Amino acid sequence: MVYFNNEEIIIRDMIFSDGLHFTDEERKQGWDSTIDKFEMRLKDVKNGKCISLVADYYGIPAGYVNVYPDSEWGAFANQGYPEIIDFAVLEKYRKNGIGSILMDTAEKIASEYADTVYLGVGLHNGYGSAQRMYVKRGYIPDGSGVWYKDKICTPYDTIYTN
């Protein structure tokens, strides 16, 4: 399905080849990307759990985002609030309005399910552009702290990630 289309950007449903493309491109920019994440999202799409969107920029997949209408994790798990998660625009395509249009589309989809939406936000500096965009769009932290593997992190504990 196509959700948005102007002369340069198309927002559409994700397909398997997008996962291969993004895995390759993210590795080229130094990210630890695997196809597993995209396969999981597409499985969730097939099971009716999420909507996975891709932004094509002049016909090339340049970014993606996922909307879970009733997310099963995080501070608002299973409360009927949609979550926007795993948002990315490849570095070489940033500053072209792709991220804003992706988020506009994701928010519009989320609004069909509830008046409140929440975000899954990465905390390392690689997500800095997205973090700044979320603030500009008016998102406010919920105050529950940092979550890892579906649990709130305990103050002063050491957390090891991949």
Regions found by a protein language model. Give the residues of each.
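Conserved acetyl-CoA binding element of GNAT-fold acetyltransferases
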Residues: 77-91, 119-120
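Conserved acetyl-CoA-binding loop-helix of GNAT-fold acetyltransferases
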Residues: 89, 95-108, 132-136
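Active-site rim helix/loop that mediates acceptor-substrate recognition in acyltransferases
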Residues: 31-54
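Ligand-binding pocket scaffold of soluble enzyme catalytic domains
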Residues: 31, 41, 64-68, 87, ...
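Conserved beta-strand in the GNAT
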Residues: 54, 60-71, 83-88
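A short beta-loop-alpha structural element at the N-terminal edge
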Residues: 6-22
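Conserved GNAT acetyl-CoA-binding A-motif
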Residues: 110-123
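Conserved active-site alpha-helix within GNAT-family acetyltransferase domains
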Residues: 100, 123-161
